[in-house]
A protein has these predicted regions:
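Long, compositionally biased stretches
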Residues: 1-62, 80-91
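Short alpha-helix capping/helix-loop boundary micro-motifs
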Residues: 31, 69-74
């Protein structure tokens, strides 16, 4: 397992201009290398203490994010625009 990271992030749409679609949380630049670099991979973690699994992905503009399912958001009691305490690790 790769060392995990902890940060606070806002839940937003993958394509904010569209205003709909996939929910993501941007991963701060300083944590990308710890997780294994800018490539797509599965992660496990928590959203405000609630366990979830997701996948990382690059966004246009050069940022890197993790996708969060509707079920994971509902379990954590979170929605679009909410701020969450996030932990991520590669299994």
């Amino acid at each position: 397992m790769v060392e995990g990271v902890r940060f606070s992030g806002r839940i937003e749409f993958f394509d904010p201009e569209a205003g709909k679609g996939l929910a993501v949380i941007e991963i701060p630049t300083e944590h990308v290398a710890t997780l294994g670099g800018r490539q797509q991979f599965r992660v496990t973690g928590t959203l405000d203490g609630t366990p979830f699994t997701g996948s990382t992905m690059a966004r246009k503009g050069g940022s890197f994010c993790v996708a969060v399912s509707k079920a994971a958001l509902a379990s954590a009691g979170l929605g679009m625009g909410d701020q969450a305490e996030v932990t991520l690790a590669r299994p």
